[in-house]
Amino acid sequence: MDPNSPMFQNTPQQPMSLQRSVDDRIDRERTAKKEKDDEKKKQEDEKILQLEKKLEEFQENARFIGDLASNFQTKYQDALNGRIYTLIRGLQDLDRMKGTFSDKNVPLDILPYLDDGKNPLLYSKHCMEKTLEKNKAVNGKIEMYKKFRAHLIKEFSEEMPDFVIEYRKERGQ
């Protein structure tokens, strides 16, 4: 027998090594995807932290300007002008940053909650409660339609039994 014949070419070791290489490749792809996803999440978190920092700076500048304006004295004019300029630069920075958050959607209904100083999580809670109420109402309607259908089939089976038998055959019931 010739060792180069096809009978000797497919040894059990080849499929095992082939399977290992496929498994290794899959593991490498999964690891690379996980690393890529982690890096993307890290970048998103950094963008959000940067936005939070800018918003806090803006809020602090606005508060300080309010204090200066409410107790205005001419000797504080330069400080007030500097803070107004800083506020304008902060708004420009926020305007430049808006492009990095174009894929984020914020519901406009949350703004009254924020204006009232409420926690945004209350908005989420109220949305969930509304959704649960709507789901209960829809589930109630579904149950009513099921009962109506059962009652209708019962009445039809008494009046037109052949029709109901044919209907059930077509529906596979």
UniProtKB/Swiss-Prot annotation:
The keyword ATP-binding does not apply. Keywords: Activator, Nucleus, Transcription, Transcription regulation. Residues 21-45 have a biased composition (Basic and acidic residues). It is found in: Nucleus. It comes from the Eukaryota. One of its GO terms (molecular function) is transcription coregulator activity. It holds the Pfam family Med10. GO terms for biological process: regulation of transcription by RNA polymerase II. GO terms for cellular component: mediator complex. The keyword Transcription applies. Residues 1-20 have a biased composition (Polar residues). Residues 1-45 are annotated as: Disordered. Its main location: nucleus. Component of the Mediator complex, a coactivator involved in the regulated transcription of nearly all RNA polymerase II-dependent genes. Mediator functions as a bridge to convey information from gene-specific regulatory proteins to the basal RNA polymerase II transcription machinery. Mediator is recruited to promoters by direct interactions with regulatory proteins and serves as a scaffold for the assembly of a functional preinitiation complex with RNA polymerase II and the general transcription factors. Component of the Mediator complex. Belongs to the Mediator complex subunit 10 family. This is Mediator of RNA polymerase II transcription subunit 10. It comes from Caenorhabditis briggsae.
